[in-house]
Amino acid sequence: MTSEKGPSTGDPTLRRRIESWEFDVFYDPRELRKETCLLYEIKWGMSRKIWRSSGKNTTNHVEVNFIKKFTSERRFHSSISCSITWFLSWSPCWECSQAIREFLSQHPGVTLVIYVARLFWHMDQRNRQGLRDLVNSGVTIQIMRASEYYHCWRNFVNYPPGDEAHWPQYPPLWMMLYALELHCIILSLPPCLKISRRWQNHLAFFRLHLQNCHYQTIPPHILLATGLIHPSVTWR
């Protein structure tokens, strides 16, 4: 008989893992929590070793905390490459976007990929412009999908014994809607996704408002992926 196991006790990342309930409340795309959680991976040069850790908001946003920690603990030659992957429960605000760009400009050997569970105050034009500026400066920003949730569950979560495969499987529709809105942001289109908080809890509901400019600019397969658009629509 094989025993059920959680993360190995010999796993050097175990002390940096978050609890399963934390992952669920932070990364559920339907939740509108104020706090932000960051799970991150760092890979140096040609090394195959990946260093993982996590962080949360303090008096500063978690992105700023990461930058301060990274720059204070690491000194490396500009010729050494470093790839960083973030899994954020909220996308960066405009001020954090600016701080990230400054950090990357001072460390040209660093590449950054950001996966986000939700878009932070995406109706705010400053936040939208901040994300566009990040993309234009070479940062990859994507909405977390099922594969990213599973990756985070396995590598960042102190899941219960036997629950490796029982990671939270959130409704794909929310991921697709956020991905659609992220396309609108990157393409400088008006917002199409409106989100409201349900009364007396954190869960949210959405309304989709598409204009002609959305149909004319966004690739049809992205619109159809939401399942809310009829394929007989004339796109262009």
UniProtKB/Swiss-Prot annotation:
Positions annotated as active site in the UniProt record:
63 (proton donor)
Enumerate the Gene Ontology biological process terms. Answer: cytidine to uridine editing; mRNA processing; positive regulation of gene expression via chromosomal CpG island demethylation
One GO CC term of this entry? cytoplasm
User: One MF term from GO for this chain?
Assistant: zinc ion binding
| Required cofactor(s) | Zn(2+)
Annotated residues for binding of Zn(2+): 61, 93, 96
Q: Which residues form the CMP/dCMP-type deaminase domain?
A: 10-134
Please list the reactions this protein catalyses.
a cytidine in mRNA + H2O + H(+) = a uridine in mRNA + NH4(+); cytidine(6666) in apoB mRNA + H2O + H(+) = uridine(6666) in apoB mRNA + NH4(+)
PROSITE patterns for the chain: CYT_DCMP_DEAMINASES_1 (PS00903), CYT_DCMP_DEAMINASES_2 (PS51747)
The protein's UniProt keywords, in alphabetical order, are: Cytoplasm, Hydrolase, Metal-binding, mRNA processing, Nucleus, Zinc
* SUPFAM superfamilies for this protein: Cytidine deaminase-like (SSF53927)
Q: State how the cofactor is bound.
A: Binds 1 Zn(2+) ion per subunit.
**Gene3D superfamilies to which the protein is assigned, alphabetical:** Cytidine Deaminase, domain 2 (3.40.140.10)
Compartments, as annotated in UniProt: Cytoplasm; Nucleus
Q: Into which EC class is this enzyme placed?
A: hydrolase
Quote the EC number.
3.5.4.-, 3.5.4.36
Task: Tell me the domain of life.
Answer: Eukaryota
Pfam families, sorted: APOBEC4_like (PF18774)
Cross-referenced InterPro entries, in alphabetical order?
APOBEC/CMP_deaminase_Zn-bd (IPR016192), APOBEC1 (IPR041547), APOBEC_Cyt_Deaminase (IPR050610), CMP_dCMP_dom (IPR002125), Cytidine_deaminase-like (IPR016193)
Provide the function of this protein.
Cytidine deaminase catalyzing the cytidine to uridine postranscriptional editing of a variety of mRNAs. Form complexes with cofactors that confer differential editing activity and selectivity. Responsible for the postranscriptional editing of a CAA codon for Gln to a UAA codon for stop in the apolipoprotein B mRNA. Also involved in CGA (Arg) to UGA (Stop) editing in the NF1 mRNA. May also play a role in the epigenetic regulation of gene expression by participating in DNA demethylation.
Which family, according to the similarity comment? Belongs to the cytidine and deoxycytidylate deaminase family.
Self-association and partners: Homodimer. Interacts with A1CF; form an mRNA editing complex. Interacts with RBM47; form an mRNA editing complex. Found in a complex with CELF2/CUGBP2 and A1CF. Interacts with HNRPAB. Interacts with SYNCRIP.
Q: What is this protein called?
A: C->U-editing enzyme APOBEC-1
Species annotation: Pongo pygmaeus (Bornean orangutan)
Name of the encoding gene? APOBEC1
